[in-house]
Amino acid sequence: RFKKIRRLGALPGLTSKRPRSGIDLKNQLRSGKRSQYRIRLEEKQKLRFHYGLTERQLLKYVHIAGKAKGSTGQVLLQLLEMRLDNILFRLGMASTIPGARQLVNHRHILVNGRIVDIPSYRCKPRDIITTKDKERSKVLIQNYIASSPHEELPNHLTIDPLQYKGLVNQIIDSKWIGLKIN
């Protein structure tokens, strides 16, 4: 993980740690002219590592975004931001996207009253995301909410921290996307 964030810069979904500031010797050695190929590859890798996708999953999302109306890049980012694991991360119910994936895989999360154990589940507007009624699930989420830095919540989400409930209001607006992609 740390090699990835050193190479690609801060990836808030992958880890809460930041690359050290200052000039590395390695960065000086590779500071030559960046080719278009290298820029595109680094941006693709940022997407993959931030959202925790495999190459095949990313290709599938690019294919879906290409068929949709609008800018392919914007539609792609909207699709990725509306994944269940990412929404849990944005709500503050998990400290990282891999942590959110684990919550979903271990069946702690309900969407509209039904257990969902697929992290790539695509949330829709008016979806209600809650925790299981088990004490263990609530304690996990409570610890994440208490320990997470209270960042500004995107417009498309609302959270009720007392009931451990989140609501998807609408599809995300492009200015609220957390990752800066070139």
UniProtKB/Swiss-Prot annotation:
GO terms for cellular component: chloroplast; small ribosomal subunit. SUPFAM superfamilies: Alpha-L RNA-binding motif. It is found in: Plastid, Chloroplast. GO terms for biological process: ribosomal small subunit biogenesis; translation. Residues 82-143 form the S4 RNA-binding domain. InterPro entries: Ribosomal_uS4, Ribosomal_uS4_bac-type, Ribosomal_uS4_CS, Ribosomal_uS4_N, S4_RNA-bd, S4_RNA-bd_sf. Keywords: Chloroplast, Plastid, Ribonucleoprotein, Ribosomal protein, RNA-binding, rRNA-binding. Transmembrane segments: none annotated. Its main location: plastid. Belongs to the universal ribosomal protein uS4 family. NCBIfam families: PRK05327.1, rpsD_bact. Part of the 30S ribosomal subunit. Contacts protein S5. The interaction surface between S4 and S5 is involved in control of translational fidelity. This is Small ribosomal subunit protein uS4c. The lineage of its organism: Eukaryota, Viridiplantae, Streptophyta, Embryophyta, Tracheophyta. The gene is rps4.
